[in-house]
Amino acid sequence: MIEQIEDSSLFDDWKKNDIYTVRILALLKSYGTAYRFATFYRQIIDGKITAILSKLDNDVTLALDDGFDNEELVRFFCITGHGSILCDPAFQIGAKFEEGVIMSSEVKRDLNVMGAGMIGISVDEYPKLMDLYNFIDYENQDFKSWYVDISHRVRHNTAKAYTLNVAGNIVTSSILSSIYDDDAVLTAVRTGEEYRRMGYGGYLVSYICNDIKGRVYIMRDAELNEHFYTDLGFKNIGIWRMYR
């Protein structure tokens, strides 16, 4: 059975902890169950929650546990419709998809050592979102909708933005787009072209990992940035899939 939840406590028996769960529960903490554009569901089989999912403007994040009913989920999406579906490859639906690598880290580094030789650097944990948006240079993402969502999450402590500045100028930025309990999902890591290969990106990522008590997850393209993140203590832990 798949049912929409109207009370966040209906997810209390969900014990799985992965990148999909962090995304879903952070979104639930941000918006609750009162909005039509953010809805949440659970699949129950023999009294056990076997899957949970969120739909934000029709884009789905799906978290799975052992014994989930794939065919019931497929029927659900066929009836309700969907945009993208972000999930583990264990879920199968007849649609085109992209795949990449999930990495995670619980490593905490000595920033004094990492920052040795970096003159005039400072980390801003509350940057102006307009400046951050312009620096990241999002494609196909209008500022208003991005600002409304990220600022709402920041106010509810389920997201956080960071910039690394040199002489008052942004050289590197990143966003924890989902924070739940002690874990988080790191996104939008960008370093200005003229400041690359100088250690700034690695310093900011390590700063952010130190700021989170538990585990930090990232999703990366299969062929990109593996050495950058492994050098910072991240490990490959799985594959993400996004159906379109």
Residue ranges and their predicted role:
Residues 1-24, 108-145:
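Short amphipathic alpha-helix that is part of the acyltransferase structural core
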Residues 2, 17-78, 170-187, 193:
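Conserved donor-binding loop and adjoining core beta-sheet/short helix segment
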Residues 40-44, 161-165, 217:
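Cytosolic beta-strand hydrophobic patch enriched in CBS
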Residues 48-49, 54-116, 218, 240-244:
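Acyl-donor-binding surface of acyltransferase catalytic domains
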Residues 68-77, 191, 197-211, 227, ...:
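Conserved acetyl-CoA-binding loop-helix of GNAT-fold acetyltransferases
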Residues 90-99, 202, 222-240:
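Conserved active-site alpha-helix within GNAT-family acetyltransferase domains
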Residues 130-185, 190:
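A mid-sequence, solvent-exposed acidic-amphipathic segment
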Residues 164-165, 177, 200-211, 218-221:
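Recognition helices and adjacent regulatory flanks at domain boundaries
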